[in-house]
């Protein structure tokens, strides 16, 4: 399911929850749900949430710069080792370019940069003595880019961990309903989103790798896009009905 659809569903689910549980709707709750509704896709390097942390154009530029710097370094080191033999050093550098471009690709670099960003954020929080649950939360997110797409981050266990960490932060900092709306947003990604795609999600990972699916259409296909619209329409209808009923 597309990122914008996940975001929309997360926001609508939050509005519905606010109506059902008679909780005032706030911008904070909606933004929180929107962010958490796309968090599971941090395990996909080109997802909406990954692009929030690091734009693809930026990572492609960084990749070029890194490769150029390494190649220049290899060339000059080779010159020194080979007694300023320009021809031999050029051959060594050319081979190095071929190997580097094969081994260091855009996706790998994005994973590294995304993880480093979240790890650095965790370290900053640790050194300014923010409560450990914040640090653990961002360290967990730092592991997501290295996970197989739709594995741990798309499981019930991940929802439980997210709820637990947010609940501790909520209690410590007295942030009303943080765990409730964060978990709703995250869970909506799974149960109102990817569960309805053909590839499904491993709900009981890591206990079982079996993927569960209530859909028959590939993400991005006409029918899957139509299904996404239908889910959004149903949620909007549910909100209107709940409002009228109240």
Stretches with model-predicted labels:
Residues 1-188, 192-246:
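N-terminal membrane-targeting hydrophobic helices
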């Amino acid at each position: 399911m597309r990122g914008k659809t996940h975001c929309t569903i997360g926001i609508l689910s939050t509005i519905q929850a606010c109506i059902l549980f008679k909780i005032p709707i706030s911008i904070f709750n909606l933004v929180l749900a929107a962010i958490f509704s796309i968090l599971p896709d941090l395990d996909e390097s080109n997802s909406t949430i990954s692009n929030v942390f690091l734009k693809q154009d930026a990572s492609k530029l960084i990749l070029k710069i890194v490769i150029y710097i390494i190649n220049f370094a290899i060339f000059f080191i080779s010159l020194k080792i080979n007694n300023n033999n320009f021809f031999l050093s050029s051959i060594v550098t050319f081979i190095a370019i071929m190997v580097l471009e094969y081994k260091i690709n855009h996706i790998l670099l994005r994973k590294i940069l995304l993880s480093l960003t979240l790890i650095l954020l965790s370290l900053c929080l640790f050194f300014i003595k923010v409560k450990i649950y914040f640090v653990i939360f961002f360290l967990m997110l730092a592991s997501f880019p290295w996970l197989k797409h739709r594995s741990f981050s798309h499981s019930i266990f991940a929802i439980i961990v997210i709820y637990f960490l947010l609940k501790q932060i909520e209690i410590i900092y007295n942030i009303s309903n943080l765990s409730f709306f964060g978990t709703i947003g995250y869970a909506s990604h799974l149960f109102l989103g990817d569960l309805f795609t053909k590839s499904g999600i491993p709900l009981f990972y890591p206990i079982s790798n079996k993927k569960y699916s209530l859909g028959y259409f590939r993400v991005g296909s006409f029918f899957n896009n139509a299904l996404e619209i239908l889910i959004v329409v149903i949620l909007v209808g549910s909100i209107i009905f709940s409002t009228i009923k109240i």
